């Protein structure tokens, strides 16, 4: 891969000129590049905002979603070439662009033997079959390139048994069935999306002896209770009855055969028999029209009120069908899954604008390219924005109008839908370089869920730059509200420092930011426009991962006019320019203090008494948080003082490195040995109920179990020590460089 060579050109030139201050030192004479900015140029920023074109974004989306582009498919590779063509354009291209390929393990349904779900009568004959494909309501849901609904990485098999309803497939749901006296051994469990991850439904089911799992989307969760064809797409934005959510059921992210290693030819590969993280039993998703046939004919006890949905009947638990229903009482459900695993080539595409002053500092902006079917919303709405933003910046670059201070890297990731594979392989291959040099990662996957308001998820240091950007951009629609002012109407919180501000969500593992945050410790954000949650309870846009996620769906229902896409492009563009051109990095580390203080207060209020009973003190944690708060405030004051004068560029460089590297100090690769890739002690998955430091919360939750002994409480103490050490290390990182 050659992107490292490209980014090194500026360094090599500096060395040849005998500038020899430090690697990538930004005190390059202006004669070397008269366009090298010393700080954010507001005129350039205004130009970029004005040139981002909603119509061009719309046409990008039309082309990107014209055909299905499943990862590694011919159309996916066609889009690789489209990106390369755009980024090498002589008038609007970037400094360089290239594709890199990884050989990864993907999962597909058999074309010769499709997956089927049948009801088998008492005599062994098939008396009813679920739909194998989605209804072709617009002419785009059929054809050989539309992959059959399936659960990626679910094993093949043909289990058959009595049907039970297991709500969302959480561990407590299966325990509830056992409490009701239902024998789960050998049954088929019908579950609904939501509550826990896809793969967890199969894992939890298998623990209780279930032989196979079905998963459906309930209209109560996605359609605001609506389910008839005249109320759903193409007549509204709601999911049609035949719609089936596809998805990866792999528990981890990255290529399954090369954990912690890039999937290049020279890498060691795990034997397939030793791969972990796949669903243990056959699993298949179905549409809610088929789920209605099954669920509304179930026998047994009435399901709890919280388990009821919107299929127009009372949900029962089973097992088996009721005697007065549509199927004989002794009928069973057969789930025949014929998925296969294949090694396939999948490509990332990188486009690079080399920094004029600090070419060894990277601002990364990325999105995945692959989709389950047409993928107009997921992910092509993000790729359409990426292409327009890179066009505008590339045009300024080619005209000689602008070159950023720091390098900008645009990325189109491959095989995200199978488990964030492209981005993970990239972070594995360039782990050290990215950790040392990356300023921030900006992710724009689904750029527009709907057109009500901005929604940003991110680590605390990026809050300030997002706020600054959105205060200067007009919100779509009537009126003169800024995106910031509109955002605060929908998502807000009361900050002890700033008062009422928009609320940033935290980053989980739902898109390509995950390896950057959890594995590399890079300050990251995810930007999108979304819906008014007071008007819909949909857990996500209704046609998510179905064949109904098409260009017309976006054009007609989500964002007519594409003004919300344009707003996302402007927000992301402003953030990129602020991060790449500002003399002082606009990352505010003191904003972490609020998060740490809230975590500490939750630990004191909800865990303090319990910990005292086991002679575990929170005193060191209190001290560590206070140290961090003091050092973060002091660093902010030093920066403010320097901004008023004419600081030495090397001094600014050192301060910027402190800002950039803070996130890395929260990494501990041994903190969560059971959680692959999760090293960030503040943002790892939290299974405990207390909203505090995840390792501490999880350990306390396990230790509360009456069966837990001294080892469980020792783990609580270990997790507390891990957090304290991380916070003390973070505070030390923020001190003046000369101070240890």
Swiss-Prot record:
Protein name: Aminopeptidase NAALADL1
Note on cofactor: Binds 2 Zn(2+) ions per subunit.
Record note on quaternary structure: Homodimer.
Keywords from the named record: Aminopeptidase, Calcium, Cell membrane, Disulfide bond, Glycoprotein, Hydrolase, Membrane, Metal-binding, Metalloprotease, Protease, Signal-anchor, Transmembrane, Transmembrane helix, Zinc
Annotated source species: Homo sapiens (Human)
Residue spans crossing the bilayer: 7-28
Lineage per the UniProt record: Eukaryota, Metazoa, Chordata, Craniata, Vertebrata
Glycosylation positions in this chain: 136, 274, 299, 334, 345, 451, 492
Disulphide bridges, residue numbers: 296-313
Active site: 416 (proton donor/acceptor)
Gene Ontology molecular function: aminopeptidase activity; calcium ion binding; carboxypeptidase activity; metallopeptidase activity; peptidase activity; protein homodimerization activity; zinc ion binding
Residues in compartment: Cytoplasmic: 1-6
């Amino acid at each position: 891969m050659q992107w490292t060579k490209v980014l090194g050109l500026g360094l090599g030139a500096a060395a040849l000129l005998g500038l020899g201050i430090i690697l990538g030192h930004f005190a390059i004479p202006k004669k070397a590049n008269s366009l090298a900015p010393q700080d954010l140029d507001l005129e350039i920023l205004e130009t970029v905002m004005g040139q981002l074109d909603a119509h061009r974004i719309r046409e990008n989306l039309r082309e990107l979603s014209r055909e299905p582009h499943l990862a590694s498919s011919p159309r996916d590779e066609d889009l690789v070439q489209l990106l390369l063509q755009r980024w090498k354009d002589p008038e609007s291209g970037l400094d360089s662009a290239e594709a890199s390929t990884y050989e990864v393990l993907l999962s597909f349904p058999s074309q010769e033997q499709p997956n089927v779900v049948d009801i088998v009568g008492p005599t062994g004959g098939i008396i009813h079959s679920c739909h194998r494909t989605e209804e072709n309501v617009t002419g785009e849901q059929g054809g050989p390139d539309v992959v059959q609904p399936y659960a990626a990485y679910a094993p093949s098999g043909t289990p058959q048994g009595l049907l039970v309803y297991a709500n969302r497939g959480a561990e407590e749901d299966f325990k509830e069935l056992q409490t009701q006296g239902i024998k789960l051994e050998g049954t088929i469990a019908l579950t609904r999306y939501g509550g826990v991850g896809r793969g967890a439904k199969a894992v939890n089911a298998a623990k209780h002896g279930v032989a196979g799992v079905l998963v459906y989307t309930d209209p109560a969760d996605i359609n605001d209770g609506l389910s008839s064809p005249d109320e759903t797409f193409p007549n509204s934005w709601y999911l049609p009855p035949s719609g089936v959510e596809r998805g990866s059921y792999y528990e981890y992210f990255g290529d399954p055969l090369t954990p912690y290693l890039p999937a290049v030819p020279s890498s060691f590969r795990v034997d397939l028999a030793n791969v972990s993280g796949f669903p243990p039993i056959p699993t298949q998703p179905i549409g809610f029209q088929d789920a209605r046939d099954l669920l509304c004919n179930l026998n047994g006890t009435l399901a709890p009120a919280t388990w009821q949905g919107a299929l127009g009947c009372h949900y029962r638990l089973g097992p088996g069908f009721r005697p007065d229903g549509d199927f004989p009482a002794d009928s069973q459900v057969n789930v025949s899954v014929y998925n296969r695993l294949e090694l396939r080539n999948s490509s990332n595409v990188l486009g690079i604008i080399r920094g004029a002053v600090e070419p060894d500092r990277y601002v990364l902006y990325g999105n995945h390219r692959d989709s389950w079917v047409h993928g107009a919303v997921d992910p092509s709405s993000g790729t359409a924005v990426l292409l327009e933003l890179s066009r505008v910046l590339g045009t300024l670059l080619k005209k000689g109008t602008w070159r950023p201070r720091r390098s900008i890297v645009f990325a189109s990731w491959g095989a995200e839908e199978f488990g964030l594979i492209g981005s993970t392989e990239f972070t594995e291959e360039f782990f050290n370089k990215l950790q040392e040099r990356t300023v921030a990662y900006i992710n724009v996957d689904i750029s527009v869920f709907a057109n009500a308001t901005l929604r940003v998820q991110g680590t605390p240091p990026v809050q300030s730059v997002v706020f600054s950007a959105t205060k200067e951009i007009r919100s779509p629609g009537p009126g003169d509200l800024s995106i910031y002012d509109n955002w605060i109407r929908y998502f807000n919180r009361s900050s002890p420092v700033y008062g009422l501000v928009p609320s940033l969500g935290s980053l989980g593992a739902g898109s390509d930011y995950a390896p950057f945050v959890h594995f590399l410790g890079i300050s990251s954000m995810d930007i999108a426009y979304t819906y008014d949650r007071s008007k819909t309870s949909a857990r996500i846009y209704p046609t998510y991962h179905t064949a109904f996620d098409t260009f017309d769906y976006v054009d007609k229902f989500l964002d007519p006019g594409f003004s919300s896409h344009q707003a996302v492009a402007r927000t992301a563009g402003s953030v990129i320019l602020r991060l790449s051109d500002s003399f002082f990095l606009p990352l505010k580390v003191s904003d972490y203090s609020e998060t740490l203080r809230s975590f500490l207060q939750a630990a004191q209020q909800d865990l303090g008494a319990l910990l005292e009973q086991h002679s575990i003190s929170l005193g060191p944690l209190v001290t560590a948080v206070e140290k961090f708060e003091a050092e973060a405030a002091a660093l902010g004051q030093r920066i403010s003082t320097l901004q008023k004068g004419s600081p030495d560029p090397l001094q600014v460089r050192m301060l910027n490195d402190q800002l950039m590297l803070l996130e890395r100090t929260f990494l501990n690769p041994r903190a969560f040995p059971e959680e692959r890739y999760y090293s960030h002690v503040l943002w790892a998955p939290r299974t405990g109920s207390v909203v505090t430091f995840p390792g501490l919360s999880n350990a306390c939750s396990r230790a509360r179990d009456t069966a837990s002994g001294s080892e469980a409480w020792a783990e609580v103490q270990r997790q507390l020590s891990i957090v304290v050490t991380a916070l003390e290390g973070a505070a030390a990182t923020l001190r003046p460089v000369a101070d240890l």
